[in-house]
Design a protein with these regions (language model features):
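Conserved catalytic-loop aspartate of Hanks-type protein kinases
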Residues: 201
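Catalytic-loop of the protein kinase fold
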Residues: 130-147
Length: 274
């Protein structure tokens, strides 16, 4: 997708625009106009190839996220349909993501420890979502934007917690396996679907903190392993023997507990980082 559709140009009247992400089924644009700076998301179906099956849900994801953001009371949210799928427009959040903020911690020979305040700000953003009765379903470092005043939790297309109109909804089939809780992986392997939960979000946050601070995934499997093999490693509990330094060490280990009931709640995570 090299150009924005007419419906977006009419809605935003951009004076500047930049495509920042172009992947199968989705493009994201940074757009600036007289009314401010916005993120524009376009979804369209993924066509089948010899390497992957066709996917229709990517066409619905932007509108589903837009509907959820609207229900959560977010401001300046617009979404709708275009000829190949759906779109949404939402405020642009300035700042690097969690993985980039902790890049110096992962440098060879670095003695810089991950800042607990950054971890707390990520936990607080997830706590705000859980407090409204929603689970995110796709917790990963790239979805925590560390802004100058607060951390923003973005990409809510897979969130669950309330009704979504039938024409915009689709089943949850897991997320990026690096951050997928064992119970989610097990359900996806068994049935092809799963149900996001706050407990699974806690696991995802723990895995996101671990890889951002150390460079290591929580679970050990080959880098080029198929997703089914990755998920089976998660189900088998092949936890990598890596921990975070300082106060984050025991906390992240608890967040990565195999049993969901053994993980702290998000409020307990925030309290532990005060």
């Amino acid at each position: 997708m090299s150009e924005l559709p007419i419906v977006i140009l009419d809605a935003v009247a951009p004076t500047k625009q930049r495509c920042i992400l172009n992947r199968r089924g989705s493009t994201v644009w940074e757009v600036e106009g007289d009314r401010g700076k916005f993120a524009v998301k376009l979804g369209y179906p993924i066509e089948a190839t010899s390497e992957w099956a066709a996917q229709e849900w990517t066409a619905l994801a932007p509108a589903r996220e837009g509907a959820i953001l609207y229900r959560l009371g977010a401001s300046y949210i617009t979404y709708g349909d275009w000829e190949r799928g759906t779109w949404n427009i939402q405020p642009w959040h300035e700042g690097p993501d969690l993985y980039h903020v902790w890049a110096t911690c992962r440098s060879e020979g670095s003695e810089i420890e991950p800042h607990e305040g950054v971890a707390r700000s990520c936990a607080e953003s997830l706590a705000a979502l859980h407090a409204q009765g929603w689970a995110h379903g796709d917790v990963q470092p790239a979805h925590f934007i560390i802004g100058p005043e607060k951390t923003h939790l973005i990409d809510l297309a897979l969130a669950h917690g309330g009704a979504v109109s039938e024409g915009r909804d689709f089943p949850y089939r897991g997320c990026l396996v690096h951050y997928e809780a064992p119970e989610i992986s097990a359900s996806v392997l068994a049935t092809g679907e799963a149900e996001p939960s706050p407990e699974a979000d806690i696991y995802g946050l723990g895995a996101a903190l671990l890889i951002s601070g150390t460079g290591w995934r929580a679970v050990e499997y080959p880098d080029d392993a198929p997703r089914a093999v990755q998920r089976q490693a998660v189900v088998d509990g092949k936890r990598r023997e890596v921990s975070m330094p300082g106060k984050l060490g025991h906390l992240v280990d608890d967040m990565l507990s195999y049993n969901p009931a053994d993980r702290p709640t998000i409020d307990e995570v925030v309290a532990a980082l005060l």
